Amino acid sequence: MSIKRLVQLFVAVVVLHSCGKKVSTEEFNSDFSLFKDYILNFSSGLVSSNTDIRVTLAFDKAEWQPNQEIDQSLFDISPAVKGKMMALTSNTIAFIPEKPLEQDTEYRIVFKLSKLIKTPKNLSEFKFSIKTLKQDFIVNVLDLQSYNREWQFLN
């Protein structure tokens, strides 16, 4: 009888945990003002699905050459995206996706700053998010009209 109760309790805890609320974007994103000594700029807000994800650092990495592929593990992106990390300049890195990002999707990025420079423990990861635009274009064509034999127009 007690094993049955334990199993029921376990199932109840699992169900309640799986129904927990998701962390909002505001709660996920790091406070940029805390990172101003390390990060100058980063991708944010609404972006095209064909864009890359960039972070501009407040310091230079002399060992980086323009368009050099760098460590993939600097970014954790959710939902997962395949692509490569590139050093665009000595202080700008970009994640370049293999395929365009999904439209109308929020991506959460964790930038592991402590892999590049020594930081206080509370500043080891910079979290930010972007949302891709929904590409939407509608053309309504009614019929073809003509002015004369050489000129036509659409209604």
Give short role names for the model-derived ranges.
Residues 15-18:
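C-terminal motif of bacterial Sec signal peptides marking the signal peptidase cleavage site
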Residues 4-11:
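Sec-dependent signal peptide recognition
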Residues 20-155:
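Acidic, low-complexity Ser/Thr/Gly/Pro-rich repeat segments typical of extracellular/periplasmic
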